């Protein structure tokens, strides 16, 4: 499935990536190949496979929590489209009660 350049530009915009024309072409090729693989996977007959299957016998294997330094504020906000007073600025989604 060959994606259009507009498709790739749209995905890049959603991911907030600035890609050069060469990078856009490379991503178009890569993403098209990935979608081709998904199309092949969709053709596999899985009717005999139970809807939920655990193949590793692992149950909730999690690492111990450990305190580590956090990301510096400047780095965290570097790609934010809008920021205010050192915080992410997002559009309000709730209406205020009257």
Curated annotation (Swiss-Prot):
Its EC number is 6.3.5.-. The keyword Chaperone does not apply. It is an enzyme of class 6 (ligase). GO terms for molecular function: asparaginyl-tRNA synthase (glutamine-hydrolyzing) activity; ATP binding; glutaminyl-tRNA synthase (glutamine-hydrolyzing) activity. This is Aspartyl/glutamyl-tRNA(Asn/Gln) amidotransferase subunit C. The lineage of its organism: Bacteria, Bacillati, Chloroflexota, Chloroflexia, Chloroflexales. Heterotrimer of A, B and C subunits. InterPro entries: Asp/Glu-ADT_sf_sub_c (IPR036113), GatC (IPR003837).
